[in-house]
Swiss-Prot record:
Belongs to the extradiol ring-cleavage dioxygenase family. InterPro entries: DiOHbiphenyl_dOase, Glyas_Bleomycin-R_OHBP_Dase, Glyas_Fos-R_dOase_dom, VOC, Xdiol_ring_cleave_dOase_1/2. Its cofactor is Fe(2+). Residues 5-119, 143-264 form the VOC domain. This is Biphenyl-2,3-diol 1,2-dioxygenase 1. It catalyses: biphenyl-2,3-diol + O2 = 2-hydroxy-6-oxo-6-phenylhexa-2,4-dienoate + H(+). GO terms for biological process: xenobiotic catabolic process. Keywords: Aromatic hydrocarbons catabolism, Dioxygenase, Iron, Metal-binding, Oxidoreductase, Repeat. Pathway: Xenobiotic degradation; biphenyl degradation; 2-hydroxy-2,4-pentadienoate and benzoate from biphenyl: step 3/4. It is an enzyme of class 1 (oxidoreductase). Its EC number is 1.13.11.39. Transmembrane segments: none annotated. It comes from Rhodococcus globerulus. The keyword NADP does not apply.
Length: 291
């Protein structure tokens, strides 16, 4: 049994109010009730999909992965322990704070806290309503989106996520960042989303390279792009990726890493073959400011 989808992300930020404005008025997320001093945001019928908590890191603090049942959660726990990972069965108080029925946690080889849970809270009685008019984000069985981690040991990270958590390799990109620098990105899936996680070995003062949210309407990408252009917050222009075929742009967050806002990613189907690429984009994704 593997994890089945990305359920939520937690980010430690130095300016919660700046994130509140960015998430709602630039990304189009809906603010949700949250513990005092923090902020949470919705993308769909779930109670929340990402949260920001105060602190100096301006970086990823936790990634929450979902499974479908208590039995599935126990199978993942057994798998991780057999792999040699210390797993903590979290308290009912933390589960209630997260809005889930059951919760375990562990730490990946790069030091990222992972929470694995079942029984997330649905809020159909309070329909999702984007403050910027985003029609719909693509979530459901594909989870909330994806994120990319900069890690010190790629082999250790890949082994953990594939052997420990049950991810599968989608493909690899050898990215020539500059004439002097080339990095290899590994893209991993745990459901039909082309990648829920990617890992890259590169010098970085942050774990989080970027996170991605996907809409079901191309116009929502263009409208978000216009909003970010107004703030001079575009890092990479509109473009289309070689591997997942997503049309997207990258914008700067108040914490310094990027958010990819996209549409149109292809789906991993049975019989998927792993391939490699020499470029990250078919067209576009030109640098507008330092990444």
């Amino acid at each position: 049994m593997s994890v089945q989808r990305l359920g939520y992300l937690g980010i430690e930020v130095s300016d919660v109010d700046a994130w509140r404005t960015y998430a709602t008025m630039r990304l189009g997320a809906m603010e949700a009730p949250a513990p005092e001093g923090t902020a949470r945001f919705r993308l769909d019928s779930r109670a929340w999909r990402f949260m920001v908590t105060p602190g100096p890191a301006d970086d990823l603090s936790v990634a929450g992965y979902e499974v479908d049942s208590e039995g599935a959660l126990m199978q993942v726990k057994t798998r991780l322990e057999a792999y040699g990972v210390k797993v903590t069965s979290e308290s009912s108080e933390l589960a209630a704070e997260r809005g889930v029925l059951g919760l375990i946690s562990c730490v990946d080889p790069a030091g990222t806290r992972l929470e694995i849970y079942y029984g997330g809270t649905e809020m159909f009685e309070v329909p999702f309503a984007s403050p910027t008019g985003v029609k719909e984000f693509r979530t459901d069985d594909q989870g909330m989106g994806h994120y990319v981690l900069a890690v010190p040991d790629v082999d250790a990270a890949l082994d953990f996520y594939v052997q420990g958590l049950g991810f599968h390799l989608s493909d690899v990109i050898d990215w020539q960042v500059s004439p002097e620098v080339s990095v290899r990105l590994h893209f991993l899936h745990c459901n039909g989303r082309h990648h829920t996680l990617a890992v890259v070995g590169m010098p970085s003062d942050k774990k989080m390279h970027h996170l991605m949210i996907e809409t079901t309407n191309l116009d929502d990408v263009g409208l978000a792009y216009d909003r970010c252009v107004e703030d001079d917050a575009v890092i990479l222009t509109l473009g289309r990726h070689t591997n997942d075929h997503m049309v997207s742009f990258y914008g700067a967050t108040p914490s310094g890493f990027a958010v990819e806002f996209g549409w149109g990613s292809r789906v991993v189907e049975p019989g998927w073959s792993v391939v490699r690429y020499d470029a990250i984009s078919i067209w576009g994704h030109k640098i507008m400011r330092g990444e």
